[in-house]
UniProtKB/Swiss-Prot annotation:
Deletion consequences: No obvious growth defects. No increased sensitivity to oxidative stress caused by exposure to hydrogen peroxide (in vitro).
Organism name: Schizosaccharomyces pombe (strain 972 / ATCC 24843) (Fission yeast)
Domain notes: Requires a bound zinc ion for normal folding and solubility.
UniProt keyword list: Metal-binding, Zinc
GO MF assignments: zinc ion binding
Positions that bind Zn(2+): C34, C37, C68, C71
Protein name according to UniProt: UPF0587 protein C2D10.03c
GO cellular component: cytosol; nucleus
Similarity comment: family membership: Belongs to the UPF0587 family.
Pfam families in the cross-refs: CXXC_Zn-b_euk (PF05907)
Highest taxon in the source lineage: Eukaryota
Length: 157
């Protein structure tokens, strides 16, 4: 069993409170390494806190149950606590914690829509895609806003 933290470091210009658009149904995508055969799998897994599954041979539940295609080891993933909105421009911050049994998280793949608020105007930006740098204009604050230099990392929690 291991707990892993998803960490973010990004340059925020004119925005704050970066988070998934609908955290309850948001799918987080990760590349994983099986702790049985040590294979890093090419296809990403997707985990959502809105899904729960019974863990085979256990009374517990997980957000995802996954079986390694190489060694058939069963892995479970649980999202612990809410996503912590990112506000700390250019500082690495833990934004999410997951408990993983049978696998390790090795890479986060940003996908889906994210939201942020204007730092000065509180304008809601609700269609942010983080696959690359993001730029927009905050009409209420009359200034450009951006999210750049995104660096996602995974560490032991």
């Amino acid at each position: 069993m291991g707990k892993f933290a998803l960490n973010l470091n990004a340059e925020l210009t004119g925005v704050k409170n970066l988070a998934p658009k609908d955290e309850e149904s948001f799918y987080y995508a990760f590349k994983v390494q099986c702790s049985g055969c040590r294979e890093i799998h090419d296809n990403a897994i997707e985990i959502s806190r809105s899904e729960t599954h019974s863990i085979p041979g256990s009374k517990g539940e997980a957000n995802l149950i996954w079986t390694c295609k190489n060694c058939r080891k069963t892995c479970s993933f649980v999202i612990e606590g809410p996503f912590s909105p990112y506000n700390d421009s250019q500082e690495t911050k833990k934004v999410l914690v997951l408990e993983c049994r049978g696998c390790e998280l090795v890479e986060f793949i940003p996908q889906g829509e994210w939201i942020a608020n204007g730092a000065e105007s509180n304008t809601l930006f609700d269609e942010i895609v983080l696959e690359d740098d993001w730029y927009d204009y905050d009409e209420n604050a009359s200034s450009e806003v951006s999210i750049t230099n995104l660096e996602w990392s995974i560490s032991k929690a």
